[in-house]
C-alpha cells in the first residue's frame, strides 16, 4: 500500500471517477486539488469545500507544482500540459493504478475493442454463482476505487486502453485482450499498433493471459508463452464445436455446454462466453457454477438487444457498436429471412469503414446513414443507401418499407457524441421509436 502523506496531489477530471479519487485521498489524510476542462463538470456540487478546484481548462501552475497527478482517462497523455509535467519528472497515474496499489484480492482484468463489458459482467456473474464476494467495475459501472473492500474475494475489472496507459502495478490473476480493431484513432495518431501497445500493458505481470486464437493482435509481443490460454471460433483451448446442426462450447476437446442452453445468441456472444469461461477457470472458479451462470445470463442492454418483435419484424438495438469491429461482429454470420435495414452513423473517430463493405453485398440489405459521418458510410454501397441528418429521420423513412421477415438493426459503427449524450441515449431513442413505428 502506497503512502501519500505530505504529497501535493492534483486530480484532472471530475465526474464519478474523479470524485472516487478525491474520496480516496481524503480518506488517507491528503487534500487534493481538482481541475477539469469543463466549466461545470458533473460532480462539482459534491466536492467538499476544502478541495480547491479549477474549471474551464487546466492549471499549469498547479500541475508543475504537483508531486502526483491523477489523470482522467478522458485526457490524452500527449496533451502539452501533461507532456510538460512528465518531462519535469512528475508522476502521472490513473485511478486504476491507485486501485492496484491497494487491492488485496486477486484481479481479473479485461480489455478489447469489443465485448469487454459483456465478458466482465459474465465473469462477475460466474463468481456470484460460486458464492464468491466479487467487485465488478472499472470502465463499466462503478469506478474501481469505489470497489475497494477488505471483504472482497475477487475483483473483475473492465479496462480501456486509456486506463491502461497510466497503469503499471496491475498483477492480474488472469488478463485478456478479447480483440483489437480500429477504435479511438483520434487519440492514437500513430495508428493501430499504438492502440494495441496500450492494450498489451494488461499482460504485464499477469499470471494467465487469455488470448484470442483468431486475432494475432491479442498475442503478447513475444508471441504466446506458457502463461497463455486461448479461445476462438474453431481454434484454441476453448472453442466452438459444430455437430449435427448443434453448437457446443468445448474446452480442450471436452464438450461442456450446448449453446441452446444459453440465453445469449450470436457467434460473437458464444466467443465472449468462451473467453469468460477461460478467465473464470484461470481465477479458480468452479466450472459447474460458471456454466450455470452462462445458462441464466441474458446479456446487457444496447448490445444486439431485441427491443421489439412485431408483425414478423425484429427491431434490434446494438447502439454499443461504437466502432467498425463491433458492427462487423454483429453482421458476421447474421441470418435474416427478409431484408436487413441497417442504421449506420455518428462520429466515426477517424476510422476506416471499408472492412464493413463485405457484409453489405446481396439484394437484401438497405443502408440508412445519418450523423457526422453518414456520407462516408453511405459511400460503402451508394445504390442501396439513403442519407439523413438524424437517426429519427432514418427510422421514419424505413418504417413504411419493412415487411414480415425483415430486421431493423441499429449497429452504427460510430460513437454517438455528435448527436447524443452517449450510446445509451441513442439506444433508448431507437427503442422508443421502434415501439412507436413498429
UniProtKB/Swiss-Prot annotation:
The organism's place on the tree of life at top rank: Bacteria
Keyword Zinc-finger: no
Catalytic activity: UDP-N-acetyl-alpha-D-muramoyl-L-alanine + D-glutamate + ATP = UDP-N-acetyl-alpha-D-muramoyl-L-alanyl-D-glutamate + ADP + phosphate + H(+)
EC number: 6.3.2.9
Pathway assigned to this chain's UniProt record: Cell wall biogenesis; peptidoglycan biosynthesis
Keywords on record: ATP-binding, Cell cycle, Cell division, Cell shape, Cell wall biogenesis/degradation, Cytoplasm, Ligase, Nucleotide-binding, Peptidoglycan synthesis
Residues annotated to bind ATP: 112-118
Signal peptide start and end residues: none
GO BP field: cell division; cell wall organization; peptidoglycan biosynthetic process; regulation of cell shape
Main location: cytoplasm
Role of this protein: Cell wall formation. Catalyzes the addition of glutamate to the nucleotide precursor UDP-N-acetylmuramoyl-L-alanine (UMA).
HAMAP family: MurD (MF_00639)
Listed name of the protein: UDP-N-acetylmuramoylalanine--D-glutamate ligase
Species this protein is from: Escherichia coli O6:K15:H31 (strain 536 / UPEC)
Amino acid at each position: 500500500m502506497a503512502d501519500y502523506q505530505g504529497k501535493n496531489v492534483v486530480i484532472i477530471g471530475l465526474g464519478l471517477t474523479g470524485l472516487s479519487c478525491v474520496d480516496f485521498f481524503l480518506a488517507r489524510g491528503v487534500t487534493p486539488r481538482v481541475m477539469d476542462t469543463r466549466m461545470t463538470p458533473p460532480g462539482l456540487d459534491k466536492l467538499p469545500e476544502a478541495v480547491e478546484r479549477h474549471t474551464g481548462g487546466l492549471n499549469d501552475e498547479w500541475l508543475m507544482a504537483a508531486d502526483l497527478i491523477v489523470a482522467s482517462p478522458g485526457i490524452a497523455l500527449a496533451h502539452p500540459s501533461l507532456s510538460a509535467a512528465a518531462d519535469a519528472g512528475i508522476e502521472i497515474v490513473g485511478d486504476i493504478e491507485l486501485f492496484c496499489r491497494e487491492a488485496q484480492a486477486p484481479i481479473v482484468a479485461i480489455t478489447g475493442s469489443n465485448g469487454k463489458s459483456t465478458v466482465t459482467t459474465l465473469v462477475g456473474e460466474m463468481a456470484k454463482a460460486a458464492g464468491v464476494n466479487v467487485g465488478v467495475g472499472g470502465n463499466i459501472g462503478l469506478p474501481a476505487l469505489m470497489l475497494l473492500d477488505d471483504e472482497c474475494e475477487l475483483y473483475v475489472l473492465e479496462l480501456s486502453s486509456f486506463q491502461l496507459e497510466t497503469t503499471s502495478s496491475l498483477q492480474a490473476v488472469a488478463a485478456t485482450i478479447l480483440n483489437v480493431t480500429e477504435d479511438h484513432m483520434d487519440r492514437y495518431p500513430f495508428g493501430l499498433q499504438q492502440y494495441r501497445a496500450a492494450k498489451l500493458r494488461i499482460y504485464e505481470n499477469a499470471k494467465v493471459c487469455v488470448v484470442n486464437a483468431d486475432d494475432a493482435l491479442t498475442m503478447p509481443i513475444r508471441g504466446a508463452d506458457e502463461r497463455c490460454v486461448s479461445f476462438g471460433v474453431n481454434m484454441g483451448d476453448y472453442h466452438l464445436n459444430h455437430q449435427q446442426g448443434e453448437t457446443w462450447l468445448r474446452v480442450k476437446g471436452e464438450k461442456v455446454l450446448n449453446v441452446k442452453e444459453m440465453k445469449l445468441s450470436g457467434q460473437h456472444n458464444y466467443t465472449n462466453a468462451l473467453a469468460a469461461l477461460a478467465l473464470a477457470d484461470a481465477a479458480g472458479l468452479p466450472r459447474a457454477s460458471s456454466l450455470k451462470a452462462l445458462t441464466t445470463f441474458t446479456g446487457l442492454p444496447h448490445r444486439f438487444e431485441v427491443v421489439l418483435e412485431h408483425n414478423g419484424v425484429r427491431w434490434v438495438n446494438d447502439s454499443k457498436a461504437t466502432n467498425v469491429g463491433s458492427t462487423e461482429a454483429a453482421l458476421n454470420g447474421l441470418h435474416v429471412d427478409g431484408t436487413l435495414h441497417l442504421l449506420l452513423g455518428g462520429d466515426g473517430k477517424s476510422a476506416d469503414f471499408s472492412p464493413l463493405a463485405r457484409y453489405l453485398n446481396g439484394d437484401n440489405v438497405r443502408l440508412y446513414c445519418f450523423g457526422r459521418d453518414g456520407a462516408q458510410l453511405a459511400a460503402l454501397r451508394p445504390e442501396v443507401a439513403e442519407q439523413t441528418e438524424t437517426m429519427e429521420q432514418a427510422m421514419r423513412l424505413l418504417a413504411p418499407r419493412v415487411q414480415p421477415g425483415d430486421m431493423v438493426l441499429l449497429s452504427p459503427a460510430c460513437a454517438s457524441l455528435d448527436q447524443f449524450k452517449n450510446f445509451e441515449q441513442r439506444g433508448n431513442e431507437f427503442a422508443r421509436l421502434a415501439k412507436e413505428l413498429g
